[in-house]
Swiss-Prot record:
Primary subcellular site in the record, as a coarse category: mitochondrion
Gene this chain is encoded by: ND6
Matching InterPro entries: NADH_UbQ/plastoQ_OxRdtase_su6, Nuo/plastoQ_OxRdtase_6_NuoJ
Taxonomic source organism: Wickerhamomyces canadensis
This protein's UniProt keywords: Electron transport, Membrane, Mitochondrion, NAD, Respiratory chain, Translocase, Transmembrane, Transmembrane helix, Transport, Ubiquinone
UniProt protein name: NADH-ubiquinone oxidoreductase chain 6
Membrane topology: Multi-pass membrane protein
Single Gene Ontology MF annotation: NADH dehydrogenase (ubiquinone) activity
Family statement: Belongs to the complex I subunit 6 family.
Enzymatic reactions: a ubiquinone + NADH + 5 H(+)(in) = a ubiquinol + NAD(+) + 4 H(+)(out)
Subcellular location: Mitochondrion membrane
GO cellular component, one term: mitochondrial membrane
Length: 207
């Protein structure tokens, strides 16, 4: 019974990871093919969200949090702010409204993007073949060699002190390294973000 429940959970988790991976690939392709920079940045944010969810599901929660804070919270929002001032506002004033058909016309109607799109499809197809081959080999190895080990999984779950495994806090370790060994880099990155915000304000004021 426990073996069947674990298999169902693993299968559902793998399906969810596959869906997130496919959405990430679609978002990355849309970033390249969309000509409007505003839509490109929006697809970039969607890509970062998918990557953060993927990292959280595989157990790397700290990297997922960093993706949301750094990429989505700082870089993507800053790009959206700048692009909205210098590109989206004149575009809105000229066209009066955003036409949804223009978003559809940007896909596969740009001749210069078709070779790049074909190259991405070939790379994606090659990686998917290797991915499914590895899954098939891993499933065969599990079915042939590890059935006896899975019979004792109930004893493993009940007899181990799991709180000792999670006793180490990754967030505390990263914070300690950032403020001690890599403090100069942290200050340098802070100044870069400060200068980027100030430059955006100055350019907006001059405009």
């Amino acid at each position: 019974m426990l073996y069947n429940i674990i298999n169902i959970n693993i299968l559902n988790s793998n399906i969810l990871l596959d869906i997130i991976s496919i959405l990430s690939i679609i978002s990355s392709i849309a970033i390249i093919l969309v000509s409007n920079p505003m839509y490109s940045i929006l697809y970039l944010i969607i890509l970062f969200i998918n990557i953060a969810i993927y990292l959280y599901l595989i157990g790397i929660s700290i990297m997922s949090l960093l993706y949301i804070l750094v990429y989505i919270g700082a870089i993507a929002v800053l790009f959206l702010f700048i692009l909205s001032l210098f590109t989206a506002l004149p575009y809105l004033l000229e066209s009066k409204n955003l036409k949804i058909t223009e978003l559809n016309n940007t896909f596969l109607h740009k001749n210069n993007n078709i070779p790049l799109f074909i190259l991405i499809i070939i790379i994606f197809y090659y990686n998917m073949i290797n991915y499914f081959n590895n899954i098939y080999l891993n499933n065969n190895n599990i079915n042939n060699n590890n059935i006896n080990n899975l019979d004792n999984i109930n004893n493993i779950l009940l007899n181990n002190d799991w709180y000792k495994i999670f006793d180490i806090n990754h967030l505390n370790q990263i914070g300690f390294l950032l403020y001690t060994e890599y403090s100069i880099l942290l200050i340098f990155i802070s100044f870069l973000l400060l200068f980027s915000i100030l430059s955006a304000i100055v350019l907006t004021h001059n405009k």
